[in-house]
Amino acid sequence: MVDYFDYKELLKRARSQLPEVVFSDVRFEIPSADSFVEGNRTIIKNFKDIAKFMERDTHEFAKFVMKELGTAGDMEGNRLILQGKFGWRMVNEKIQNYVNEYVLCPECGKPDTKIIKEGRIHFLKCTACGAMKPLKSL
């Protein structure tokens, strides 16, 4: 005897066997900045790791963070050393601003983007949906 299942029952059964991560819309979570204040300087210990995770140029990323914080800084190995005292929350907020502006696609919201240059203008090109957005220069 052949056992026939209702399509909705099969779908429900299949979905129940999948992990919760599959249904989550968030697949791109930036590691938080491991920063601390030392004297009159703020040091972000895992700065290069964050840039590598986002697949962005470290120097352009550092330039953005320094401009947003209104300070000078220097790369030293894996760390970014900023002149001035900045709290952990403020540093992470500036990193999130960078992600929203230069990493996430404005159309589909996916992080599968690349920065390309056409003429004198930089564009954020999404490899997932094909959308292109002109970027502000740093």
UniProtKB/Swiss-Prot annotation:
<comment type="subunit">
    <text>Heterotrimer composed of an alpha, a beta and a gamma chain.</text>
</comment>
<dbReference type="InterPro" id="IPR045196">
    <property type="entry name" value="IF2/IF5"/>
</dbReference>
<dbReference type="GO" id="GO:0003743">
    <property type="term" value="F:translation initiation factor activity"/>
</dbReference>
<dbReference type="InterPro" id="IPR004458">
    <property type="entry name" value="TIF2_bsu_arc"/>
</dbReference>
<comment type="similarity">
    <text>Belongs to the eIF-2-beta/eIF-5 family.</text>
</comment>
<dbReference type="InterPro" id="IPR016189">
    <property type="entry name" value="Transl_init_fac_IF2/IF5_N"/>
</dbReference>
<dbReference type="InterPro" id="IPR002735">
    <property type="entry name" value="Transl_init_fac_IF2/IF5_dom"/>
</dbReference>
<comment type="function">
    <text>eIF-2 functions in the early steps of protein synthesis by forming a ternary complex with GTP and initiator tRNA.</text>
</comment>
<dbReference type="InterPro" id="IPR016190">
    <property type="entry name" value="Transl_init_fac_IF2/IF5_Zn-bd"/>
</dbReference>
<dbReference type="Pfam" id="PF01873">
    <property type="entry name" value="eIF-5_eIF-2B"/>
</dbReference>
<keyword id="KW-0648">Protein biosynthesis</keyword>
<keyword id="KW-0396">Initiation factor</keyword>
<protein>
    <recommendedName>
        <fullName>Translation initiation factor 2 subunit beta</fullName>
    </recommendedName>
</protein>
